[in-house]
Amino acid sequence: MILGMGTDLCMISRIEKSVERFGDRFLNRVFTEAERAYADRFTGAARMGSYAKRWAAKEACAKALGTGFANGVLLQDIGVCNGPGGAPELLLSGGAEEALKRLTPSGQEAQLLVSMSDDPPFALAQVIIQSVPLAGVQSAPQASVRIEPLANAAKLR
C-alpha cells in the first residue's frame, strides 16, 4: 500500500550559491557526514549535482512523510546513501524515523523507494513510501478482479 509520495525539483545553482556563501556551515547543517564524503569525491559541476540531488531527495522524502521539515523532522534526519549496486537509498533517523513509524500501519513495515537524477540546471528526486506485511504476518486477502471477454459487450449497450 502506498503511504506517501513526494517529488522535488531543485536548481543546482541554488545549492552552489549556498555553498559559496556559507561553505562548510551550510554543508554540515544540511548533509550527513556520509553524504558529504560521497559528494566530495567529485569536483565542480558533478559535486554540486550530487549535493543538489541529495537536497531534492530530502525534500521529496519530507513531502512523502507528510510533515515537510516540521514536527521535529530535520534535514539531517534524512540521509541519502548508495547501496551495493549503486542505487540510492534513504536512511531515516530522529524525527523522520518517528514520522515514518507513525505513518506505518500496525503489522506492516515501510519501504522507502527513491529515484534521483540531475541534468543541469536541475536536480530531481522522487520518493515513494509503501508498506508491506511484516514477515510471518498473515495479511488480509486481496480482492480479485475478473476480466470478462468482450464477447458480451453488446449486452452492455
Swiss-Prot record:
Cleavable signal peptide: none
Necessary cofactors: Mg(2+)
Q: Which residues form a coiled coil?
A: none
What is this enzyme's EC?
2.7.8.7
A single GO CC term for this protein reads: cytoplasm
Cite the entry's keywords alphabetically. Cytoplasm, Fatty acid biosynthesis, Fatty acid metabolism, Lipid biosynthesis, Lipid metabolism, Magnesium, Metal-binding, Transferase
- Write out the residues that bind Mg(2+): 8, 59
Gene Ontology biological process terms from the UniProt entry: fatty acid biosynthetic process
The kind of enzyme this is, by top-level EC class, is transferase
Q: Which GO terms describe its molecular function?
A: holo-[acyl-carrier-protein] synthase activity; magnesium ion binding
Q: Which reaction does it catalyse?
A: apo-[ACP] + CoA = holo-[ACP] + adenosine 3',5'-bisphosphate + H(+)
Where located?
A: Cytoplasm
Tell me, in a sentence or two, what this protein's role is: Transfers the 4'-phosphopantetheine moiety from coenzyme A to a Ser of acyl-carrier-protein.
Family to which the UniProt record says this protein belongs: Belongs to the P-Pant transferase superfamily. AcpS family.
> Under which name does UniProt file this protein?
Holo-[acyl-carrier-protein] synthase
